C-alpha cells in the first residue's frame, strides 16, 4: 500500500514539475506528533522492525522517490522525561550506501544531540523536529496566557510562543551545522 501510494504521488508531482523533490517514508515510525510518557502498547523498536538496506533500495526502485525517510530507531512524537531510543547509525550508513539518495530523519524530536550529529554524518540531510517545535510553541502560548489571564489581544499573548519556537529552531540550526566539532 505504501509503495503504491508513494509511486502515485511521485508520478503526479513529476508530471507537474520534475524538479520538485518527493520524499518517501518506509518502515514503522509511528503516526502521532505528541509527547508520551512511554512507548504505546504493542510498539517496540526492535532491530528486525527497522528498515533494511535491501528494503530501502527496493522501495526507492519501485517508487522513484528523491529522498528517503527510513525507520532507523526514530519515532514520531517524543517522550516527556527521557530521550527517544537511540538511532541505529550503522543502519543509516548502510541505507545511504544502498540507495545513494539523501536521507531524511522523520520523528527527530526527542533524539539526543549526539544521535543527531552522528545521523547527519552518516547521511541524513533533512531532520524533522515538528513535535519539539510544537511543544515549544505550546509552552510559550501557555506562559503568555498565564502571565496575563485577562489579556485577549493575540499580539500581546503570542510573542512568548514565537520566542519558544525561535529558541528551538536556532538551537537545532546551530547543532545541525556544527559538524566539524568533535563528538564527545
Where are these regions (language model features)?
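Thr-Gly-centered strand-to-loop micro-motif
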Residues: 105-107
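Active-site-adjacent substrate-binding region
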Residues: 102
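Extended, intrinsically disordered, low-complexity segments
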Residues: 144-184
Amino acid at each position: 500500500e505504501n509503495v503504491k501510494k508513494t509511486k502515485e504521488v511521485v508520478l503526479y508531482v513529476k508530471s507537474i514539475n520534475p524538479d520538485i523533490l518527493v520524499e518517501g517514508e518506509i518502515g514503522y515510525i509511528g503516526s502521532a506528533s505528541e509527547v508520551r510518557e512511554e512507548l504505546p502498547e504493542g510498539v517496540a523498536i526492535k532491530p528486525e522492525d527497522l528498515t533494511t538496506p535491501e528494503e530501502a533500495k527496493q522501495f526507492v526502485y519501485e517508487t522513484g522517490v528523491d529522498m528517503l525517510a527510513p525507520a532507523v530507531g526514530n519515532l514520531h512524537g517524543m517522550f516527556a522525561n527521557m530521550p527517544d531510543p537511540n538511532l541505529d547509525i550503522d543502519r543509516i550508513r548502510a541505507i545511504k550506501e544502498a540507495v545513494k539518495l539523501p536521507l531524511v530523519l522523520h520523528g527527530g524530536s526527542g533524539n539526543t544531540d549526539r544521535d543527531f550529529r552522528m545521523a547527519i554524518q552518516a547521511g541524513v540531510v533533512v531532520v524533522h523536529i515538528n513535535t519539539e517545535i510544537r511543544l515549544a510553541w505550546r509552552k510559550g502560548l501557555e506562559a503568555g496566557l498565564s502571565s496575563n489571564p485577562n489579556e485577549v489581544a493575540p499580539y500581546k499573548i503570542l510573542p512568548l510562543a514565537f520566542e519558544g519556537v525561535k529558541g528551538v529552531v536556532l538551537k537545532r540550526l546551530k547543532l545541525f551545522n556544527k559538524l566539524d566539532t568533535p563528538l564527545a
